[in-house]
């Protein structure tokens, strides 16, 4: 019998092959947790990148991975029944604001049906704390900055945002009815090594290195609260051992809190491009384009709530974070893509 495995706290991380999920799983194993990770390894972007993230976790005997879809209620039910999880961090979701306009069903299946399966899993198999990913997109076209958790979130401007808003509503109902302790984290534009290829920083670096033109929407007059991955992981790790208590006053008995997790320092896209140019030592070709459907002008997180609860203090400035991403892209990601291209050429030869 493996005594160490039996005494370690067990955590389920959904979306473990994703950008945030893989970083979190690695951090949790190093902190002494027994981590079970699941992911459906879909083709929203290259599964090769997702597999490479998982490969970096394989050296830990305290990480187990299962390829499965959170929308599969039968498999999810068995997973929770057999897992004995102390805590759950739910990060699996169909991401992307613009992709949701053309592929709405993917968002319903993953972000709504999948989240319901997670809620049912913890209802039937109680755990100490369910932490789930919400999004800054729930603030919609809110023009009052910085965004605070008390601001209205009743007017989402994308299908993705609507699904994340629904997650918060379902979480409240389940916590109110069943006493499930939950924390929803509204992520603000996460970036860094092993990031998603559909995100702006990834696209901009790739375009500049390839000599392609960057599209800057709304004439480049958009700003985002870019948050480095290490700061995000630090925030999750800090909140994980702090399940909320039932409200002692008011109309809701839910053991639920919703918190922003961001950098608290928005960056305009024009400035972002300059920072990337400096990190690459190359100049970008830029095309100024109109506002995109479903986009918002700014995101800007107040992190006072998370700071008061955990001491959270995002530490990585945009210049340092971009430099780290560029180094990873040149060293690791380009090698990964070269391997993929070689394998493709070999298969058709």
Model-derived features: positions:
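N-terminal Rossmann-like NAD(P)+-binding domain of SDR-like oxidoreductases, especially those catalyzing
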Residues: 1-190, 236, 240, 312, ...
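C-terminal substrate-binding subdomain of Rossmann-fold SDR/epimerase-dehydratase oxidoreductases
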Residues: 24, 30, 208-349
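Amphipathic, non-transmembrane alpha-helical scaffold segments
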Residues: 108-111, 160, 205, 262, ...
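A glycine/serine/threonine-rich, flexible loop-to-helix segment
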Residues: 145-146, 197-205
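Conserved donor sugar-nucleotide recognition element shared by glycan-biosynthetic enzymes
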Residues: 159, 167, 197, 269, ...
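Hydrophobic alpha-helix immediately C-terminal to the catalytic Tyr-X-X-X-Lys motif of short-chain
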Residues: 166, 170, 174, 204, ...
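Conserved GTPase G-domain signal focused on the G5
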Residues: 194
